[in-house]
Amino acid sequence: MYLRSRHLPRREMLKGLGVTLALPLLDAMVPAGRVWAQAPKLRLACVEIVHGAAGSTAFGLKKNLWAPAAVGRGFDLSSSSLSPLEPWRDWITIVSNTDVRSAEAFELQEVGADHFRSSAVFLTQAHPKQTQGSDVFAGTSLDQYYAKRFGQETPIPSMQLSIENVDQSGGCAYGYACVYTDTISWASPTEPLPMVRDPRVAFDQLFGVGATREERAARRLEDRSILDIVTDSIARLRKDLGAADQARLSDYLDNIREIERRLQRVEAYNSSGESRELPDAPIGVPDSFDEHAKLMFDLQALAFAADITRIFSFKLARDASSRVYPLSGSSAGFHNSSHHGDREALILDFEKINRYHVGLIPYFLEKLKNTPDGDSNVLENTLVIYGSPKGDPNVHNHKRCPLVLAGHMNGKLKGNLHLKAPDGTSMANVFLRLLHELGVDDVKSFGDSSGEFDLTTVPASATAGARG
């Protein structure tokens, strides 16, 4: 490949044997005499955490363990699980007091099955059909509505990632197929999309490493970076770039190489014969939840930077997970902790886990904010949805469910805002508004929506002391 001018097409790729490396947005990709595009493409990252929140309990509401007391802009996060987002308050919109009604039991035989139904509802806001067969039925998820409209503009329309085991098949419990628990992305009401748990698999998919599983395995045995395969192409490209583009390219390539090193360390340890906390996990899956989540966030940030895909869904845990999070300060398993028996001390212990999970999000936001995107940054042009389809997990209800939006969505969200929905408002109303802001404006209803929720205006009736 020889570049004869400083102008590059946006889809310029560096290709080598079994590798296709997309590039970040560079000044050289803007034709001479033109300015950066006025409306950068929006990215979407949907992050689900199961088991609701301590702040959705009666005690949690009183103590503002999730939603802050003040509605509007003068809110205090010091007592909230959202406190790790305080440095990012100008980038977040908290939407409290919404319900996920479609996750409730509609029939007597569905009672008690919330763990096996809820994740299918999060991004679809649709009530899943109770079946253990292949005739599953839920709804098209928010991320896939966006992917169908705009996903074909990128090499990969969308990607689905997860942390825990999501490859179970057949029926799980209470008459529900495991797929309802395994994924949050649905291409249609009958098409659940598989989620990728192994960071190495996600990396290989993003960077076109190997056409077959055998080719990818063989390349890993070579123990060299994908950048080594395209070294000559990188060198030729650099000659045609200005100083700013060279620095941007170097940062991008350094991030790729660092992720590769981390993946190699994980694989080396997991194949060393040392005992593992997750002995049944694929070789590329870290035992450390923290490292696993950060690798997945790093991959999303890289993909957004290079416009490989603009759409991710990310499942941080499997419903009914008993995983212990040592860094949270709680020694209880996630599921056991969520069944706190309405005891205040146990609710506060569960809140430690909620706070720990939220504490992972600033890592992602920092990556996005530090990634240039035209004359702005990627976080400015991204919507991150973080939430849960459960409210108080002790009683398996779906009221006052956690939901926070991050990023400015290309100016459509202003941040530094807490909005409290009227009692009985469906989370689907929020998602319908988000779909329209994402450009999917021909969708008239979503799940059990009854209208659109205004995401920028504080109601005149809101007071500084309003309870979240």
State each model region's role:
Residues 1-468:
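Ligand-binding pockets and gating/stacking loops
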